[in-house]
Amino acid sequence: YQRYANDLTDGFVEAEKILQEERIFSSKDLPYTTQLIPLAVLCTLLAEHNRIKTTSVKDKIKQWYWCGVFGEMYGSANETRYVYDVVGVMAWLEDASKTPKTVQEFYFNPVRLLSLQSRLSAAYKGIMARILKNQCKDFISGREMDFTVYKAESIDIHHIFPRDYCEKKGLPRA
């Protein structure tokens, strides 16, 4: 493992950059910590000739990533999925017809949105990241939610309207 330690470390750094582009700024907001492993491996493999920096490659990596999150595919039995995904994504980058298993098997039932009430859910964290990515603004300052605002304002994804406020106003839970 020592032979590849520096390359893998660089891969994790690149994976962090991709996650920040997708508005995942902290480990507590990471939908699946387990999906970070194949993401970092892919970033490591694609570092050669800076392939990971190209838009077309990055777009496919992000598509694979979000299919894994919203398909809720990294909750258990991940070691086999790591292999399928790394091999599958690398093949997909060479041949667009070779879609990786996670992208092929992706399915998100919209009814699932009604049950996302816990910030511990990967899909909940994913939705919050997608909201942040789509130019949402801070309620107080009106500034677009970027890394600077996220850190400066100690943004948390657990709720928009505080429970105590809703209860005092008699608002229904759902």
Descriptions of predicted regions:
Residues 1-6, 164, 173-174:
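Short intrinsically disordered, low-complexity coil segments enriched in acidic
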